[in-house]
From Swiss-Prot:
Cellular localisation: Membrane
Record PTM Phosphoserine, positions in chain: 152
Species per Swiss-Prot/TrEMBL record: Homo sapiens (Human)
Family per similarity comment: Belongs to the SPATA31 family.
Residue numbers spanned by region Disordered: 290-338
Gene name as annotated: SPATA31F3
GO annotations of cellular component type: membrane
Keywords assigned by UniProt, alphabetized: Membrane, Phosphoprotein, Transmembrane, Transmembrane helix
Name by which UniProt lists this protein: Protein SPATA31F3
Compositional bias (Basic and acidic residues): 290-306
Pfam families in the record: DUF4599
Superkingdom: Eukaryota
Amino acid sequence: MLSPTFVLWDVGYPLYTYGSICIIALIIWQVKKSCQKLSLVPNRSCCRCHRRVQQKSGDRTSRARRTSQEEAEKLWKLLFLMKSQGWLPQEGSVRRILCADPCCQICNVMALEIKQLLAGENNQISLTSLGPSQGSSCLEALSTSSVSFKHSQDLGSPKSKELSLASVTPTLSQLMDQKSLTQSAARSAGADSVQDSWADHFQRGQRSQVPAVSQVMGSLSSNFEKPGIPLSQQERTKNNSKFVLENQEAPEVGLDNKMKLFLHWINPEMKDRRHEESILLSKAETVTQDRTKNIEKSPTVTKDHVWGATTQKTTEDPEAQPPSTEEEGLIFCDAPSA
């Protein structure tokens, strides 16, 4: 009853199913692996790119250094050959080739550098140190040197060329000496002007201090010499005068300290003058202290005296003097403050 077809079907069906499941799993695994490889490839490529860029930058710097060194060596070799053969160019023609404007600082500096190279000097001239006056003087020096070169070429002797090159160098030294002299003169003039201004400021401050002290002393004496002033008003005037003196002395002390340091730094001869001024100020302070002590010792008007004076006035002439409520209120307000 069993045919071979049915047997194969019964055995092959599960094999087909399990085999298909395994094949699907293998396909999924391969897909995941390929995705992981694709994700890792960009990182490796980026690292390789960075390495290549770094190597290229290092190679470029090394090549630039080598080329600069080679160019410098070639330039010195050319200069040596030109000097040995007497093939030196004219400086005037070099300046004309660079620029037609005689006031161009860049071209003037380049012409000076060429002149130094031709003369065999290694000093470098900065662009900021050259002004319009120096540019004109440099142009004059170049013109004189060009004339000397033309004359030497007419003669046709290399020794005369060397002498003309040597004659150009003193002109540069003279220009630098003139510049240093002008700078030193400007610095000395600036120091003198600063010293004069500080001296004027010091004299003005001294003049302003003397009348201020005299005004304060006069106000103190006038306030304390007035008879019949209540005790509270006298104390208020004392407090006000002390506050004014403290406010005047605090900034004056700070200014005095700053002036001492600065003047002693500029001119040590001002130290003795400042010592005399400090002695005068100390004497003025002692005088003010003595006067305040004498005023405190002097008898003062009390509450009873004021009350008695007011009652006497009211009893002597009650009809002529109407009742003043405002004055009495002021007296009562001032009395407890004393």
